[in-house]
Amino acid sequence: MSITTLAVPGVRGLTPYQPGKPIGELEREFALKRIVKLASNENPLGASPKVLEVVRRILGGTHLYPDGSGFELKAALAEKLGVEPAQIVLGNGSNDVLDLVARAFLTAGRNAVYSEYAFAVYPIATQTAGATGKTAPAHDGSRGPRFGHDLETMLERVDPDTRVVFIANPNNPTGTLLGRGELYSFLAALPEHVIAVVDEAYFEYARRPDHPDALEWLGEFPGLIVTRTFSKAYGLAGLRVGYAVTGVEIADLLNRARQPFNVNTLGLAAAAAALEDTGFLEATVQANDAGRSQLEAGFRERGFDFIPSAGNFVSFDLGRPATPVFDALLREGVIVRPLGNYGLPNHLRVSVGTAEEIDLFFAALDRVLVP
């Protein structure tokens, strides 16, 4: 008997999440001196100087457990977002919060619905909870933006056993964005037995006229959960801080399932400081707009189709299997993200970096594509 047969079926059938290749691993493998990492949608500006100052100040207290309630961070978030602290659930990154939702609402005999090309954590959280994942095909371009969520088809996938619908807006890895009217209509059409999770990890980057702020609808939809993170625009990916905002009753349920001390001392303090530095956030968004335009212009110049993005990354179609190009870029010291695991074997996703990093990426791409 294989020891793996003792595990629950949902875990046995999982494909592990593949993070971006670490810089240290590439240094060891190829003995490279200069490495450009554009794989994990991190903030190329780093973290706010105010955050770094706070972290240095509290390093001497790391032998103490953190505030398990996250009181100060929840108070700061509540004030900024116009909600009550009791509506907020803190997590070890927003992935932790997504997993909490699955553990609270999914089990064997229930299912979750999400879109094709949706964030890979949704099926992981769903299957680990023993539930079934139902994938709705994305738009093919005939009725909506290609690669975007087809909300009509997602709604058709909902049945009496559906308990959760996951929607990323903007979506990762495609960068596609749902407009205010279409997302509202979808939420209004969901039956009462379905929890709607709107994953807004890239919210701060998506400054489009029709971009919805799902927090505005919390009072109207009791089953709505909005998740956000400090890993992207706030530059705290290494400290792992995310959160959910929802109704008080759902927040209470999620907090019952939450592990004690799931957010560390440094993360709590850093996130609170990051919220205060609005100037750094604005600089981040402006730099991202410029970098995203630089990427799109480079792809356009080289004749590559790309998916217009509202996030801090752009995915493009090589027109050939992407893995060999990905491997060749690694040898050049450039780390990007292949999307074969998302069903896009010809695509690479490139995070927005500094202007210099983007130039280095395109120079490396040109070298590896020379016949």
UniProtKB/Swiss-Prot annotation:
GO biological process entries: L-histidine biosynthetic process
Keyword Amino-acid biosynthesis: yes
Obligatory cofactor(s): pyridoxal 5'-phosphate
Gene Ontology MF terms: histidinol-phosphate transaminase activity; pyridoxal phosphate binding
Entry's EC annotation: 2.6.1.9
Entry keyword annotation includes Oxidoreductase: no
Keyword annotations from UniProtKB, A to Z: Amino-acid biosynthesis, Aminotransferase, Histidine biosynthesis, Pyridoxal phosphate, Transferase
Catalytic activity: L-histidinol phosphate + 2-oxoglutarate = 3-(imidazol-4-yl)-2-oxopropyl phosphate + L-glutamate
Post-translational modification N6-(pyridoxal phosphate)lysine, affected residues: 232
Pathway recorded for this protein: Amino-acid biosynthesis; L-histidine biosynthesis; L-histidine from 5-phospho-alpha-D-ribose 1-diphosphate: step 7/9
Pfam annotation, one family: Aminotran_1_2
Highest rank taxon of the organism: Bacteria
InterPro entries (UniProt xref): Aminotrans_II_pyridoxalP_BS, Aminotransferase_I/II_large, HisP_aminotrans, HistidinolP_aminotransfase, PyrdxlP-dep_Trfase, PyrdxlP-dep_Trfase_major, PyrdxlP-dep_Trfase_small
Protein family (similarity comment): Belongs to the class-II pyridoxal-phosphate-dependent aminotransferase family. Histidinol-phosphate aminotransferase subfamily.
Subunit structure: Homodimer.
PANTHER family noted in UniProt: HISTIDINOL-PHOSPHATE AMINOTRANSFERASE, HISTIDINOL-PHOSPHATE AMINOTRANSFERASE 2
Protein name: Histidinol-phosphate aminotransferase 2
Organism: Methylococcus capsulatus (strain ATCC 33009 / NCIMB 11132 / Bath)
